[in-house]
Amino acid sequence: MKYIVVTGGVMSGLGKGITAASIGRLFVDMGYRVIPIKIDPYINIDAGTMNPFQHGEVYVLKDGTEVDLDLGHYERFIGEEVTGDHNITTGKIYKRVIEKERKGDYLGQTVQIIPHVTDEIKSWIRRVAKESNAEICLVEIGGTVGDIEGMPFLEAIRQMHNEEKEEDFALVHVTLVPLDAGGEQKTKPTQHSVKELRELGLHPDVIVGRCSERLKPATKKKIALFCDVPEEAVISNEDAEDIYEVPLIFKREKLDEYLMRKLNLRAKESRKEWEEMVKRMKTLYEEASIAIVGKYVDVRDAYLSIKEALKHGGIEAGCKVNIVWVDSEDLENVDDFTLDVDGILVPGGFGARGAEGKIRAIEYARENGVPFLGICFGFQLAVIEFARNVVGFSEANSTELDENTPHPVIDLLPEQKGIDEMGGTMRLGDIEVTIKPGTIAHKLYGSEKVVERHRHRYEVNPEYIEKIESKGLVFSAYSDGGRRMEIAELPDHPFFFATQFHPEFKSRPYRPSPPFVGFVRAALKYRREEEI
């Protein structure tokens, strides 16, 4: 097993996740199976209860584990579907150590950070790597070198480095190379970051410099001199127009060749699908504007997978997607409004704040023939809007938003009743969905059975299905033997489509999600017709 560990210095938010995912992509293109592990030093067990304003999107894995958004980058770049074991948190490690202590596994020892916590970290990494049957294990340590939360993990990595063969271990350190007022690239932050890393017993094999422009030869030479690495191990990672260009930047920098020599590997093949995908993406000449109507629009990472899935759909449809961010609360405070866009998307979410604004956006899309895609909460709100304005249940609602609504067209899942804990208790992960033949959904997917990821507590109330369908809204897919509605569509609308599941979590740049492809194609058609 070869281990590539990615750490970060100077500041958070430099793009360690994209760096790690891009390195993984390089090895995938050379014919290797790569498996990622993301270490998050926070004490939370998982990301499921975290506020999107603080943490961005909660990404859902196939086994239902709620994780950091970087796991989404890994799945999209590397092409592997992973499980909750591929996300290590301080909470998980401490929980495991405490459980062992309670069972007496430590035989009366004083349980300490070293060796018990560090041994648990190493054991977890090696177990996941072995069970994956991969050839390369990519480990990203979240946070910044020097953070107190990350110290046990860095110590565990130091020990692993000493325990593994030199040719089986590579450490990549991502740092910031800022520009001063005169435009000079400054290396001092990188020097200090590497110094701090070395004080912990770790020496980087590769230094990736994040900068607004390509690192100059003189900058690379200076970093190499003061940080004690070869010049060829100083890699430029300048700002790119799109994150999918980063693997190509690394290939230009010959990072793949350097790591192959360090790990004593040879390329098995030379795949071009990623490079070809980026070329297609950069040559799209038609455009369509799509509004994302949500309440977390000030934190764009809260809808990261949706942004990426729209991009994937655009590549397939031959169309560049321009996103227009609309705060749903703003739509609640106006008598009338116009959304000058080619498509409207209402994403997942929770709670009453902004919900009525989303319902108004859905009504606008339905009445004006604007292509619409609803996801999870957006699916539920689409059902509510239809029940109110077409079926005639003017006070229809979800019991999440109004416990006393006379028409609870959306209600709590039966198995959710009586659950008090929030973390990891929703209907989560991959679930098989059955699609009815002859529907828009069947045309998009081309199959009667699909597997999609879920994250919800509420569902369409079965008592209202027949009444709603009698007025024209078709529930075209279901799960759990027909008990749960999964897709709603309007056959006579240019494109009105909503899913209870989250199709964005399984969308890939070279294998886009069918609902997003259909949605973007409909938006492009709408734009063409508007221009005539």
From Swiss-Prot:
Residues that coordinate or bind UTP: 12, 186-191, 222
- Catalysed reactions listed for this entry: UTP + L-glutamine + ATP + H2O = CTP + L-glutamate + ADP + phosphate + 2 H(+); L-glutamine + H2O = L-glutamate + NH4(+); UTP + NH4(+) + ATP = CTP + ADP + phosphate + 2 H(+)
Q: Does the keyword Ligase belong to this entry?
A: yes
Which InterPro entries does this entry report, sorted A to Z? Class_I_gatase-like (IPR029062), CTP_synthase (IPR004468), CTP_synthase_N (IPR017456), GATASE (IPR017926), GATase1_CTP_Synthase (IPR033828), P-loop_NTPase (IPR027417)
Q: What is its EC number?
A: 6.3.4.2
| Residues annotated as domain Glutamine amidotransferase type-1 | 289-529
Instruction: Note whether Transmembrane occurs among the keywords.
Output: no
Give me the residues that bind CTP, please: 12, 147-149, 186-191, 222
Per the record, the GO terms for biological process are: 'de novo' CTP biosynthetic process; pyrimidine nucleobase biosynthetic process
Indicate which residues the UniProt annotation says bind L-glutamine: 349, 377-380, 400, 457
Query: Which residues are annotated as active site?
Result: 376, 502, 504
Per its database record, what is this protein's job?
Catalyzes the ATP-dependent amination of UTP to CTP with either L-glutamine or ammonia as the source of nitrogen. Regulates intracellular CTP levels through interactions with the four ribonucleotide triphosphates.
UniProt subunit comment: Homotetramer.
Q: What else is known?
A: CTPSs have evolved a hybrid strategy for distinguishing between UTP and CTP. The overlapping regions of the product feedback inhibitory and substrate sites recognize a common feature in both compounds, the triphosphate moiety. To differentiate isosteric substrate and product pyrimidine rings, an additional pocket far from the expected kinase/ligase catalytic site, specifically recognizes the cytosine and ribose portions of the product inhibitor.
Which family, according to the similarity comment? Belongs to the CTP synthase family.
Q: Protein name, please? A: CTP synthase
